[in-house]
A protein has these predicted regions:
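Non-catalytic DNA-recognition/assembly elements of restriction-modification systems
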Residues: 23, 27, 37-55, 243-285
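Polybasic, glycine- and aromatic-enriched phosphate-binding surface used to engage nucleic acids
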Residues: 26-29, 33-248
Length: 285
């Protein structure tokens, strides 16, 4: 093609028309039918995740080899259990549930005196001392050499919460009830105290893992490859949430999904279908 005009005339591109009166501070360039779908959800819902939940990122160790160990490692039995935390990685998060993880985190920030914990210091973390000392926070004297780079507050992990990967092909939101810690490529959120009697974790994952909410999120998500999307909290926590007469039904079906998965059953399509229909009915889509 010798000109843009000729290229456009050839009709090999999809055309989108934007009207000034529909443009707000957040530009969303989408098909008309997708905008109708998106707007129905935005207009119907009275809450967003950021209204009812607190979000946080996983831990940055600064050197995974020093702090993350396989549960099958023979030496793990030598470590005091109070320093070992369940460690969840991105790939272990599925819809609704988390796969059995293979790893444990040594939460070394709880070590008050390195001489009191010679096994952890000498047999595990100490092997990487030189590398750990080169971390920016250690050079600035903000961290002891054996501490995690960004260990966060333990309390935010040691509670019921919803975890999700920061990159995914689809919505994957899982309930964690095992006080799991996670790597930095996993984000989590928990329901704020004032909303604990209004929303349940089971209801939220029922919505978020549905076909409707998968489509809804992707309309405004950043696409990073042919099929993968960013799931950063700046977009995830803006997801709109509703509560209406279908709340109990959706919550109950979601609990049934969780029970089946915990029992080792993989076929949940019938329950997902029912959840999706209830959501569509509520939203009028």
């Amino acid at each position: 093609f010798h000109s843009i005009e000729k290229l456009i005339e050839n009709n090999i591109f999809e055309r989108l028309i934007l009207y000034k009166n529909t443009i707000n501070k957040d530009w969303i360039i989408i098909k008309k039918e997708d905008k109708t779908f998106y707007d129905k959800i935005e207009d119907y819902c009275n809450y967003s995740l950021e209204d009812i939940c607190t979000s946080f990122q996983g831990i940055i160790t600064g050197c995974d080899k020093a702090f993350v160990i396989d549960k099958d490692d023979e030496k793990i039995n030598l470590i005091d259990d109070r320093f070992l935390k369940s460690w969840v990685k991105n790939k272990e998060i599925q819809k609704y549930t988390i796969k059995d993880n293979r790893y444990k985190l040594i939460y070394s920030n709880d070590i008050k005196n390195e001489s009191d914990n010679p096994i952890i210091i000498n047999d595990f973390i100490g092997k990487y001392k030189e590398r750990l000392l080169n971390r920016r926070e250690c050079k600035k004297k903000l961290r002891l050499w054996y501490e995690l780079q960004w260990g966060r507050e333990k309390a935010i992990f040691e509670r019921k919460k919803i975890m999700y990967p920061y990159k995914s092909f689809e919505n994957r939101f899982a309930i964690d009830e095992n006080n799991s810690f996670s790597s930095a490529d996993v984000y989590s959120f928990y329901i704020n105290k004032e909303y604990e009697e209004i929303f349940s974790y089971e209801y939220l994952v029922g919505l978020l893992n549905s076909e409707v909410y998968n489509k809804y999120f992707k309309i405004n998500a950043k696409k990073i490859s042919k099929n993968a999307y960013d799931y950063y909290p700046n977009k995830v926590m803006k997801i709109k949430i509703f509560k209406d007469s279908n709340y109990t039904h959706i919550e109950d079906l979601s609990k049934q999904v969780l029970q089946r998965l915990k029992n080792g059953e993989s076929n949940i399509s019938d329950l997902e279908y029912k959840i999706n229909n209830l959501i569509r009915g509520s939203l009028g889509i």
